[in-house]
Amino acid sequence: MAMAKLAIFTTLMAILVMTSQGRIPTEGGEKEAEADRITSLPGQPNVTFEQFSGYVTVDKLSGRSLFYWLTEASDLPLSKPLVIWLNGGPGCSSVAYGASEEIGPFRISKGGSGLYLNKFAWNSISNLLFLEAPAGVGFSYTNRSSDLFNTGDRRTAKDSLQFLIQWLHRFPRYNHREIYITGESYAGHYVPQLAKEIMNYNKRSKNPLNLKGIMVGNAVTDNHYDNLGTVSYWWSHAMISDRTYHQLISTCDFSRQKESDECETLYSYAMEQEFGNIDQYNIYAPPCNKSSDGGGSYNGSSGRRSMRLPHLPHSVLRKISGYDPCTERYAEIYYNRPDVQKALHANTTKIPYKWTACSEVLNRNWNDTDSTVLPIYREMIAGGIRVWVFSGDVDSVVPVTATRYSLARLSLSTKLPWYPWYVKKQVGGWTEVYEGLTFVTVRGAGHEVPLFKPRAAFELFKYFLRGKPLPKA
């Protein structure tokens, strides 16, 4: 009898300890989640938080399955919101960029030999869910090859919603948690489009998703104003000549998906003859000509890719870059390791191609892209969804001028006029708060803001979750 009481007492104490740490025993509906638990990744330092990764099927008929990686909060995860991070491209991996270069808990060592801690990881104050979408990106796959040549915004949004619904069945402890959707670049489409799918779902569901807000950075927003703002940025930052600038302005119809041959030629001339060998994602950072791990030239198929952003003319090729600036290579080495894939429960179907940071097949066959997402912004603002938009001010791909031109079309009333915000007594950037939307610049940051300015990005994220204006001192 005494032994039985002791066993009961021990069990209750164990549950109490787990609850005090913000964790709950896994049982019932979460048995499936337990199979996704990551015990440890190769070369990983010791951590106190829990990790899960695996696949969620979003379309059984075609066999479309999306890969995710959840890194729970390092302290009291049950009290923290769920933050979904999406990378753009389209066709680029949130595991390669968001998780491994920007906001995740780990960075990849040179040569892909192991991992080290990111001291500005966003999972210190949230539960981070990285999603590789659509199928064909990273470890996500489809059994119907035609999906890779026939995808776009609408299917991506619908599959992402289906993923989230199914994922919450697997992780019921997140069912009523506050949800925030974040991302950058072409995720300027993914994020608001997923938010709209959630809002529509909530109207017809008995179990609505607790979407609280979105935040996007250097985000593709509106074709016309993004393109106009991009060309203006090139000229104002002395990247192109007066002559080329005026020719682009007078020749190109920035609203069109497919530009005239004359306009395409002007874009190509500007980038090939006038830009020079720069990193377009951070015009003041060194380009990745040689990998710093001694791998020699790094312009091949497994290195930086020339990718097209759909808001730009079809012939315009953009480099997807990182900053060391060759970190993309480390990710491709690390995530192609069989021991890493096993630890992540990834590539379980033995996909017949290597894991890559970006899919050129998807990027070049993207056939459905909205010309603007500004109407969705209006819907979110009207629906009380928190909306923050930030911009690294040395990115020339989706530059700050593009974002400002696009947001100006919303004609929002100003609540707090333009002012500098501070990080460690230094100007972190500038911000303006509108009715329903906060706009923030990050000084000296490139396209991947958390990569170039991790401390400032973390402060930005912290205030976003609080729903408070950034500090004036």
Swiss-Prot record:
The active site is at S185, D395, H447. Glycans are attached at N46, N143, N289, N299, N347, N367. GO terms for cellular component: extracellular region. Ubiquitous. GO terms for biological process: proteolysis. Disulfide bonds join C92-C358, C252-C263, C288-C326. Belongs to the peptidase S10 family. Keywords: Carboxypeptidase, Disulfide bond, Glycoprotein, Hydrolase, Protease, Secreted, Signal. Pfam families: Peptidase_S10. Residues 1-22 form the signal peptide. PROSITE patterns: CARBOXYPEPT_SER_HIS, CARBOXYPEPT_SER_SER. GO terms for molecular function: serine-type carboxypeptidase activity. The gene is SCPL25. Its EC number is 3.4.16.-. It is found in: Secreted. PANTHER family: SERINE CARBOXYPEPTIDASE-LIKE 25, SERINE PROTEASE FAMILY S10 SERINE CARBOXYPEPTIDASE. It is an enzyme of class 3 (hydrolase). It comes from the Eukaryota. Probable carboxypeptidase. This is Serine carboxypeptidase-like 25.
